């Protein structure tokens, strides 16, 4: 499924899409954290589906299908652990930490990629949670990547409301999607085609696939708005003196 991007959005459309995107990314971040009983109840009573469907429909013009959740919280948690933490024989389907996927490292050491992601976070005033706040964030966990996309969507909406140029935050969203979010979602969606035992909740399987499709369409939408993504190497080759200190995000 693809977002509707055939015509440039009006002011009101752009604001509505930014707010719907914020909701969708934030709901994704919630879903990919370790399951808690409140999330299971939201799956059972339909409130999680209702929230995703509202955002998804606003972005794509299509309803979001509802999957049947596990009846017991223990089954939801067991499926998540088997898929993403340690499955049968200690083998999970896929880690939710980007730094544990060689395909995403592209020959770089994990600390370097962590530093790159933290540069995004710091630029927009975010910091890592610490143990005295109840949890410790892993900056390369899929939930953190999706939460950051929600923050960028929120900032885009704020810029539109305030009459400011949303271009800088849109360029940041484009760069973050291309470099981190889309490849991570693509990898996990591909891996989840294989069954796990116990099975992963069908809502999470669908959400992974559909978030990847939305990430793809969002990259195309942003490219039309602020230009296509260019790697640091490409910028350096074309303008070596300026690229080293260029701030694309305002």
UniProtKB/Swiss-Prot annotation:
Region Disordered, annotated ranges: 231-250
Q: Where in the cell is it found?
A: Cytoplasm
Q: Write down the superkingdom of origin.
A: Bacteria
Q: Does the keyword Cytoplasm apply?
A: yes
Q: Which residues form a coiled coil?
A: none
Q: What GO cellular component entries does it have?
A: cytoplasm
Give the InterPro entries listed for this entry: DMSO/NO3_reduct_chaperone, DMSO_Rdtase_II_chaperone, TorD-like_sf
Main location as per UniProt: cytoplasm
Q: Which UniProt keywords apply?
A: Chaperone, Cytoplasm
The cysteines covalently paired via disulfide bonds are none
Task of the protein: May function as a system-specific chaperone protein essential for the assembly of an active dimethyl sulfide dehydrogenase DdhABC.
The family annotation for this protein states: Belongs to the type II DMSO reductase enzyme chaperone family.
Could you tell me what this protein is called? Dimethyl sulfide dehydrogenase assembly chaperone protein
Q: Which organism is it from?
A: Rhodovulum sulfidophilum
The gene designation is: ddhD
């Amino acid at each position: 499924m693809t977002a509707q991007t055939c015509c440039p959005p009006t002011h009101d459309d752009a604001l509505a899409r930014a707010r719907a995107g914020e909701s969708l990314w934030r709901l994704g971040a919630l879903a990919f954290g370790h399951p808690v009983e409140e999330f299971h109840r939201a799956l059972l009573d339909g409130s999680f589906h209702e929230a995703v469907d509202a955002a998804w429909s606003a972005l794509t013009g299509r309803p979001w299908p509802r999957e049947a959740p596990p009846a017991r919280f223990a089954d939801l948690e067991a499926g998540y652990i088997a898929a993403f933490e340690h499955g049968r024989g200690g083998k999970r389907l896929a880690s939710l930490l980007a730094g544990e996927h060689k395909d995403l490292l592209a020959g770089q050491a994990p600390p370097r990629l962590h530093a790159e992601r933290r540069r995004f976070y710091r630029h927009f005033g975010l910091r890592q949670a610490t143990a005295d706040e109840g949890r410790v964030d892993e900056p390369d966990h899929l939930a953190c990547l999706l939460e950051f996309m929600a923050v960028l969507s929120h900032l885009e909406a704020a810029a539109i409301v305030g009459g400011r140029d949303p271009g800088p935050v849109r360029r940041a969203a484009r760069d973050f999607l291309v470099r981190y979010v889309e490849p991570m979602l693509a990898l996990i969606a591909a891996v989840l085609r294989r069954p796990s035992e116990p099975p992963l909740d069908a809502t999470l399987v669908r959400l992974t696939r559909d978030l990847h499709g939305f990430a793809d369409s969002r990259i195309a939408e942003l490219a039309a708005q602020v230009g296509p993504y260019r790697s640091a190497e490409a910028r350096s080759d074309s303008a070596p003196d300026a690229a080293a200190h260029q701030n694309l995000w305002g």
